[in-house]
Amino acid sequence: MSSLDEVAESRKQRLAELRKIKQLENKTRDSQEVQKNVIEHRNYDPEVQAPKMGFVEPPNMIESVEALSKEIEEKTKRKIEEQSSVPVEELDLVTLRPKKPTWDLERDLKERMRSLETQNQNAIAFYIQQLISERAHSTEKA
């Protein structure tokens, strides 16, 4: 019977521990619910009982759009100055020649023409064979 008493005692201890854990969880839930019910005054100052005017905190120095645009403007000015400092004599006019106005059309047509090229060659061969056979028939008749 002593073993049954030990098992019962250990069970009582485990249940007591579970009750304590559950009570702690309930307390934390209650405190969280209280925190949720706190009213945030974003535009209203309860001490003055009037709307907030101006900035409460000083502006921070996070990168703004204006700062970024100034940086981009300075970079482009530097690039333009670097490009203008390159002497004209160094540029080779032969390498700067423009492409044909239809270069992109030719590029697109090359793929289509590949498949048509074999058909074209077959048709030419057929007409040549037909011409040869007609000449052979005409020489036989004559």
Curated annotation (Swiss-Prot):
GO cellular component: cytosol; nucleus; post-mRNA release spliceosomal complex; Prp19 complex; spliceosomal complex; U2-type spliceosomal complex
Keywords: mRNA processing, mRNA splicing, Nucleus
Keyword check for Disulfide bond: no
Annotated Basic and acidic residues bias: 24-45
GO BP field: mRNA cis splicing, via spliceosome
Principal cellular location given in the protein's record: nucleus
Keyword Nucleus in record: yes
Superkingdom of origin organism: Eukaryota
Subcellular location: Nucleus
Chain intervals for the UniProt region annotation (Disordered): 24-54
Known partners and oligomeric status: Belongs to the 40S cdc5-associated complex (or cwf complex), a spliceosome sub-complex reminiscent of a late-stage spliceosome composed of the U2, U5 and U6 snRNAs and at least brr2, cdc5, cwf2/prp3, cwf3/syf1, cwf4/syf3, cwf5/ecm2, spp42/cwf6, cwf7/spf27, cwf8, cwf9, cwf10, cwf11, cwf12, prp45/cwf13, cwf14, cwf15, cwf16, cwf17, cwf18, cwf19, cwf20, cwf21, cwf22, cwf23, cwf24, cwf25, cwf26, cyp7/cwf27, cwf28, cwf29/ist3, lea1, msl1, prp5/cwf1, prp10, prp12/sap130, prp17, prp22, sap61, sap62, sap114, sap145, slu7, smb1, smd1, smd3, smf1, smg1 and syf2.
Role summary: Involved in mRNA splicing where it associates with cdc5 and the other cwf proteins as part of the spliceosome.
UniProt protein name: Pre-mRNA-splicing factor cwf18
Classification of source organism: Eukaryota, Fungi, Dikarya, Ascomycota, Taphrinomycotina
Protein's gene: cwf18
